[in-house]
Amino acid sequence: MTKSELVAQLATRFPQLVLKDADFAVKTMLDAMSEALANGHRIEIRGFGSFGLNRRPSRVGRNPKSGEKVLVPEKYVPHFKPGKELRERVDRRAGEPLKAEDPDDDL
């Protein structure tokens, strides 16, 4: 599902929301989450999962063109850990055959 599909589904599910307002709501939520992660905070959405940061230590890598050793500095990368309810919901559907995505399935 893309951001635009999420906006469309939100506007469909809540007819009182204009598409523009649904887009604003999704953008605001994603901006707030991005800002929280950028500031080193953890985000927890009960039943869905949590977003946090994992530290990747510095290491010695290789330049693929020249083969020269280069130092890759440490960095922090976003990480998502699914919650129990989400894991169970996905697991229940794991035995079903995959089908083409239909945006109306989740309504």
Swiss-Prot record:
List, as start-end ranges, the regions of compositional bias called Basic and acidic residues.
82-101
Annotated region (Disordered) at 82-107
| Pfam families for this protein | Bac_DNA_binding
Does this entry carry the keyword Transcription?
yes
One GO BP annotation of this record: regulation of DNA-templated transcription
Q: Keyword set for this entry?
A: DNA recombination, DNA-binding, Transcription, Transcription regulation, Translation regulation
Q: Does the record carry Ribonucleoprotein as a key word?
A: no
Name a single GO cellular component. Answer: chromosome
Q: Which SMART domains match?
A: BHL
Q: Name the CDD domains for this protein.
A: IHF_B
Q: Which NCBIfam families match?
A: hip, PRK00199.1
> What is the annotated role of this protein in its UniProt record?
This protein is one of the two subunits of integration host factor, a specific DNA-binding protein that functions in genetic recombination as well as in transcriptional and translational control.
Q: Which HAMAP family does UniProt cross-reference here?
A: IHF_beta
Q: Which family does it belong to?
A: Belongs to the bacterial histone-like protein family.
Q: How does it assemble?
A: Heterodimer of an alpha and a beta chain.
Protein name (Swiss-Prot/TrEMBL): Integration host factor subunit beta
Biological classification of the source: Bacteria, Pseudomonadati, Pseudomonadota, Betaproteobacteria, Burkholderiales
The gene name on file is ihfB
